């Protein structure tokens, strides 16, 4: 990870960071979920060195429901660097929806053929089975709060989507997100399971339920 990338990682509050460091010092991370449990949000522990910060249960549920509504019946959904949303979608057992997780962390390969290894530094290096403009909705949460990361992730988003985009990133990225993807900030404010010092927001390029009251 470069020094600039380190600066762009969403920041934990000092109290949360201390607790998280203590947690990692005391426990080994292991991935051995089975059955339906493997779709529980948080079953795979955050690795904050990879800038992983999972959504709260309520936020993951709200975003998953929005994704289902936006994609429509039988819709195809791509979750780009947004594993919490993928897990909640699969936890909801919507078998009529096709959902894929695009993720750098190979621990998520437990999800079989729905896992697509993804490195935002190579935004278009995707398997041949992933066709251009083959997803009704792309949900994306770029790992770093930088123009470079958002720009490269945007290339992936534009390749994958048939039109609809749901982006989750820092409030400070609003202008760049609008320029790159034509998205607007929603009223809904996402929350993470661990408190972040950065303000996060959701953005869409369509009329979404995230502008309505919960």
UniProtKB/Swiss-Prot annotation:
Protein name: EEF1A lysine methyltransferase 1
PANTHER family: EEF1A LYSINE METHYLTRANSFERASE 1
Location within or outside the cell: Cytoplasm
Modified residues (N-acetylserine): 2
Protein EC: 2.1.1.-
SUPFAM superfamilies reported in the protein's UniProt record: S-adenosyl-L-methionine-dependent methyltransferases (SSF53335)
One GO molecular-function entry: nucleic acid binding
The protein's enzyme class: transferase
Function: Protein-lysine methyltransferase that selectively catalyzes the trimethylation of EEF1A at 'Lys-79'.
A Pfam family annotated for this UniProt entry: N6-adenineMlase
One GO CC term, this protein: cytoplasm
GO biological process, one term: peptidyl-lysine methylation
Key words of the record: Acetylation, Cytoplasm, Methyltransferase, Phosphoprotein, Transferase
Annotated positions of the Phosphoserine modification: 2
């Amino acid at each position: 990870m470069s020094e600039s990338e380190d600066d762009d990682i969403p920041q934990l509050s000092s109290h949360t960071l201390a607790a998280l460091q203590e947690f990692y010092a005391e426990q080994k991370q292991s991935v051995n979920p089975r059955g339906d449990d493997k779709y529980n949000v948080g079953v795979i522990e955050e690795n904050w060195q990879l800038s992983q910060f999972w959504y709260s249960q309520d936020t993951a549920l709200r975003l998953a429901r929005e994704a289902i509504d936006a994609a429509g019946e039988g819709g195809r959904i791509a979750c780009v660097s947004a594993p919490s949303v993928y897990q909640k979608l699969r936890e909801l057992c919507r078998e009529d929806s096709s959902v894929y997780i695009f993720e750098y962390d190979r621990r998520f390969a437990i999800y079989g053929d729905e896992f697509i290894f993804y490195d935002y530094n190579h935004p278009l290096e995707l398997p041949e089975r992933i066709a251009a403009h083959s997803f009704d909705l792309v949900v994306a949460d770029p790992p770093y709060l930088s123009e470079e990361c958002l720009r490269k992730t945007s290339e992936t988003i534009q390749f994958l989507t048939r039109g609809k985009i749901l982006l989750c990133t820092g409030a400070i990225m609003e202008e760049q997100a609008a320029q790159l993807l034509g998205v607007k900030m929603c009223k809904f404010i996402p929350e993470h399971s661990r408190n972040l010092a950065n303000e996060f927001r959701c953005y869409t390029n369509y009329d979404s339920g995230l502008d309505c009251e919960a």
